[in-house]
Swiss-Prot record:
GO terms for cellular component: bacterial nucleoid. The keyword Glycosyltransferase does not apply. This is DNA repair protein RecO. It comes from Methylorubrum extorquens (strain CM4 / NCIMB 13688) (Methylobacterium extorquens). InterPro entries: ARFGAP/RecO (IPR037278), DNA_rep/recomb_RecO_N (IPR022572), NA-bd_OB-fold (IPR012340), RecO (IPR003717), RecO_C (IPR042242).
Amino acid sequence: MQWIDDGLVIGLRKHGETGVVLELMTPEHGRHLGLVHGGRSRRMQPMLQPGNTLRATWRARLDGALGAYAVEPLTLNASRLMDSGLALYGVAHLSALLRLLPERDPHPALYEAAQILIAHLDDPEIAPALMVRFELALLAGLGFGLDLSHCAATGANDALVYVSPKSGRAVSASAGEPFRDRLLPLPPFLRDRDQPGSGWRTPDTQDVREGFTLTGYFLDQHVWRPRAQDTPEERARFVALGTGQS
């Protein structure tokens, strides 16, 4: 068995005296592990840092085996991101989110979103908002997507300012007003489908805080609490730095 794909480094662990088990997020083969012989050498270590993108060739005798990687550098982001505390926590949080995906389950859209996020993680003006969007996309990839397109009560697609914590669906201002204390805020930038580079406007800090409150609620309900986990420290630190709370 053999394939070649690009891969974002999201984790590694020691294996034997000189090797590592490398974990990549790839567009065509999903989250995939493989052994890198000599991965702990001085030559290989800088390449195998989380946040870097590699060209990987995976080989194994059987499809279900761990297999081995041969890797070449494509985009080495780690050295650039090391100078930013926000970026370092962002890489750690992004990697942890991607590790929630089932192994070998392709998610090409999430891979592309992760690459966009990595490219901007050291930009405090837009990285936090991009992370909120990525968390929403990850929830959808795990089967817990939110419906923010129209009001759950009226079907209208305007004046959407709340989200129901029970259904994960948007609620309009008029329909939600009597229950506002029980609803989650829907910040404007999550209703805006524009993307960076095409008229996308940077949301303000309060909007980003509300975005993290929204995604954090559903991540807690569907991901962390069922696993008996608290909010990961890397997320808490990224949110604090990204919203001016540290």
